[in-house]
Amino acid sequence: NSPLAESSIVGTAVGMAVTGYKPVVEIQFGDYIWTAMMQIRNEVATMRYRSNNAWTCPMVIRVPVGGYIHGALCHSQSIDGYFIHLPGIYIAYPSCAADAKGLLKMACRMDDPVIFMEHKGLYRQGYAATEEPDSDYLLPFGKGRLVIEGDELTIVTWGAMVQKSMEAVQLLNLPDGLIEIIDLRTLNPIDLDLIESSIEKTSKVLVVHEDNITNGP
């Protein structure tokens, strides 16, 4: 057991990671991850760089994030806009159960730190309860998913905004084949090949996210 102190949770995980363990820890709400920023920014993210690849800091930090649960200011924050700019850390942000399992299993097998964001608005939602391909399913990082195909506009999104984007398209009652939706699945690395191939077709892109407008993802 660990104390409900984010700096201690991540700091303990750092010590375990550099001594051969693979810790999987949870920050109860992304809103409180900031007290662990010294450990994440200066220790976890820089371990490989500072040691010239002699040391790594493999761990998985699970972080529930996002709004839509009436959690007010301390239980609704989105943190992807910050962490996507932080080098040295992989970021997963699934939109459904199958992707969550495949990405989490892959994260546990990687030799680098992973921040695994879980949108609270997806918990216990029927539309997020997807079937897994098989019990050994692994989903590689950096491989997005083409949700629906279209040739007029590309929507690039992730997490809970995938469903919100699909609902918006349905609400507008647009003909099929106009809107293309891409679910990134991971924010670091990003599937640039999938994005580029879609934009070559549509020539227009809309990024849908839940973080700050200024300096967001």
Model regions: which residues?
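Thiamine diphosphate
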Residues: 1-117, 120-217
